[in-house]
């Protein structure tokens, strides 16, 4: 921690999530952004990309400007900029970075992410699912974090939406089995027009004018953060031509019979209690753009869901897959720091 008591963070990869994690960090008084690494963007271009955002609007908290080729100024706050391609070359230690947000989408396993430790960082939070780093979803299993874990994953935006909802339903009524569909906004890996995508042919089709079926590991990943649900959930995705905000459709068979009103009441109670700020609840006639900038992980839409019987129900929950997720990255870091 810095002399001000703030947690010092660095960001590797200044893409969608990297820039929004920076915004979230700069809006908080318990976090200090001290360094950013991106080999593909100059400092003046970083300033422009940070300041102007087609989805979340212009940054208005303070002026952002270039001090020199290695320093950005956010108001009076200087942030060091590196341009290293290899994580082990980034001198995080020189700037006092304790926690690195690994948001390139490239270094998602423990071995690759560990390179940041060589550069002087103490901990790494991967902003994507990881095949071998332990995954944490704030509000669900972050209490299982142990201080000796140096590299962790914040899971995916969809897992962060699904897991709190699934936890409430499983705790209260028990889930026998379930299927999830996420209707998901476009992301950076998609194509503006039809183009090559060898591993996912459908994913190479134009994002702006297609509904594209896709795979997602989000439902299975819930089994990693909630072992009681391991093997009970799976799912798929539809990529749709919206710039941000996605929605989870969770259809489950319940162990304990419950009316839809009882399910709504349970979710509402949790949203105002232990999961306040993580799980939301609304009975308004909302649509996707109403959730742009919502920092909660999952907002249950009481009017959109429907029950077939007391044991079989469809539940609908919204999430800003960019802003909500980026908010949880910072929350996870704050929780990790509190255990030291």
Swiss-Prot record:
The active site is at residue 157. It comes from Ginkgo biloba (Ginkgo). The keyword Transport does not apply. Homotetramer. Its EC number is 1.2.1.12. Belongs to the glyceraldehyde-3-phosphate dehydrogenase family. GO terms for biological process: glucose metabolic process; glycolytic process. This is Glyceraldehyde-3-phosphate dehydrogenase, cytosolic. Key enzyme in glycolysis that catalyzes the first step of the pathway by converting D-glyceraldehyde 3-phosphate (G3P) into 3-phospho-D-glyceroyl phosphate. Essential for the maintenance of cellular ATP levels and carbohydrate metabolism. GO terms for molecular function: glyceraldehyde-3-phosphate dehydrogenase (NAD+) (phosphorylating) activity; NAD binding; NADP binding. The lineage of its organism: Eukaryota, Viridiplantae, Streptophyta, Embryophyta, Tracheophyta. Plants contain two types of GAPDH: cytosolic forms which participate in glycolysis and chloroplast forms which participate in photosynthesis. All the forms are encoded by distinct genes. Gene3D superfamilies: Dihydrodipicolinate Reductase, domain 2 (3.30.360.10), NAD(P)-binding Rossmann-like Domain (3.40.50.720). It comes from the Eukaryota. It is found in: Cytoplasm. It holds the Pfam family Gp_dh_C. NAD(+) binds at residues 16-17, 38, 85, 321. Pathway: Carbohydrate degradation; glycolysis; pyruvate from D-glyceraldehyde 3-phosphate: step 1/5. Its main location: cytoplasm. The record marks 184 as: Activates thiol group during catalysis. It catalyses: D-glyceraldehyde 3-phosphate + phosphate + NAD(+) = (2R)-3-phospho-glyceroyl phosphate + NADH + H(+). The keyword Ribonucleoprotein does not apply.
